[in-house]
Amino acid sequence: GVNVGFMPVGQIIGAGIADCGYAWLLIPIGMVIGYFIVAAEPAVHVLTKQVEEISNGFVTAKMMQTALSVGVCISVGIAMLRILTGISVLWFLIPGYVFALVLTRYVSPIFTGIAYDSGGVASGPMTATFLLPFAMGACEALGGNVMTDAFGIVAMVAMTPLITIQMMGFITQMKEKAKRRYIEVQMHQLEDDILYFD
């Protein structure tokens, strides 16, 4: 199924876009494919539902799905940029993982755990069987070195959810703190308004 279906199709689409005379289209088209390919990963659906159940709805499946889709979208966009420019993958991977590690100091451990699980889930069968051949097809059509320019897309897809999920957690935590502060202020105002009669 993989050899007859996804891999050749991915390679043909990648090569076709690269050969059309507007190679820069690889970036936006790749990002759109990356955004929607997350929905085709079976493990993603299992993970998002489990996270929603374990967190008692605090982290919804929709939030998780969106964060993962955005992460993969960005990673595929960067991978296509690399194919067009030949920039080393290390310029993205090292700062990306450093940033992900820094975020672990400021984000709740539950979000950190979810983020690191999500990295493995997002880089599942669809990434290996469609996105990688897509990148290889584009790279070959542009005359690039497949061994250096096309590879690294799976590593990028595994890295970006670490950042996007933890960023989602950080924003959620900030919202919760702001909500608590607002409630505290309202409670103080109510206490000030109470009149006591002897």
Range-by-range predicted roles:
Residues 62, 67-74, 120-136, 185-193:
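Small-residue-rich segments of transmembrane alpha-helices in multi-pass membrane proteins
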Residues 151, 155-180:
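Membrane-helix cytosolic exit motif
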